[in-house]
Amino acid sequence: MIDSKSGTSGGGREPNQKLLLSECGEGLSAYGLINHRHTSEIEQIASSISGNNIELLFTPHLIPISRGMLSTIYGRLRDPGLTSDDCRILLDNFYRNFNNIKVLPVDTY
């Protein structure tokens, strides 16, 4: 399950009334709940990386910021013996060359 929040810049460059600050300011809304255009892409990449067929639920939300994204991803681990610190090390190693992704320390929110 992926719960993502993004700013209005994710809506593209075309003028859109629902992306105006007067329309989306002080609120948030879910969109693209069924068959979001990025769901199949995320499933394909996750399946390729894991070596398993991954099916997921993706719920994007529009929040009143100009840019940025926060995603919380939930799932079951193949190895139930992994600790939070183990997972953090794995994520740090995987994303070490991605300057736009920041893996936060365990228990940081």
Put a short name on every predicted segment.
Residues D3-Y109:
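C-terminal substrate-binding/catalytic lobe of Rossmann-fold NAD(P)-dependent oxidoreductases
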